[in-house]
A protein has these predicted regions:
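Bacterial N-terminal signal peptides
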Residues: 13-27
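Small-residue-enriched, tightly packed secondary-structure blocks
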Residues: 34-199
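Residues at the start of alpha-helices and the adjacent loop-to-helix junctions
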Residues: 10, 23-25, 43, 74
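Sec/Tat signal peptide C-region and signal peptidase I cleavage site
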Residues: 26-34
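N-terminal secretory signal peptides that target proteins for export/translocation
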Residues: 1-10
Length: 199
């Protein structure tokens, strides 16, 4: 009788230990899976650091703009650093060149062009950082990204807009000496080689 009781007690103890330890065993696995799924994405600190070194002394309000982008769109899996120039009174053109940076597929030079239509004032020579979301492959960046951008440099000289192609989002963050206020309805065409044709 005693050995039967002892056997049941041992079984209950083993069950208790198994139930107690199983969540502890599962937690690291779940955390590792989550870390693995985010391994191709950039943290906010990584983007802020890249932006500060790129924009230099003008980067005072950059962290606030990046924080707003992360709150709206989450973690990007790529970012572009480059320069563009455009100027318009009612209609104009935008040209730029830069580099796509990814964690899993390296760095890729690229160019962008596009019309800028709407109520634009002034000229613009701008450094630009673009956050890239849901990019399935580097080839998917070579496309037309359209959107409505209301640019007002309200955070220490930085403006943020949104462009989209299918599920891929591009969020340009710009700074520059020009002031372009109003509604800019246009698109950016991203190409692997330079071209003067924005269409």
């Amino acid at each position: 009788m005693r050995s039967h009781f002892h056997g049941r007690f041992s079984a209950i103890c083993r069950l208790f230990v198994a139930l107690t330890l199983s969540p502890l065993i599962l937690v690291p696995t779940e955390g590792a899976a989550q870390q693995q799924s985010n391994s191709g994405q950039y943290s906010m600190q990584e983007i802020v650091d890249a932006g500060h070194s790129f924009f230099g002394s003008t980067s005072g309000g950059l962290a606030k703009v990046i924080e707003a982008a992360f709150q709206k769109y989450g973690l990007p899996n790529g970012y572009i650093l480059g320069q563009e120039g455009s100027g318009a009174f009612i209609a104009g053109l935008t040209y730029g060149e830069g580099q796509l940076n990814t964690k899993n597929a390296g760095e890729h030079p690229l160019y962008w062009q596009g019309p800028s239509l709407g109520i634009d004032y002034g000229g613009q020579g701008t450094r630009v950082m673009m956050l890239v979301y849901d990019l399935p492959s580097t080839d998917a960046i070579y496309a037309r990204f359209g959107g409505v951008s209301g640019q007002a440099f309200v955070v220490a000289g930085f403006g943020m807009t949104l462009l989209k192609n299918d599920n891929v989002l591009v969020v340009p963050i710009r700074t520059g000496v020009g002031a372009r206020l109003g509604l800019n309805v246009g698109y950016l065409k991203v190409t692997p080689d330079p071209t003067w044709n924005p269409f």
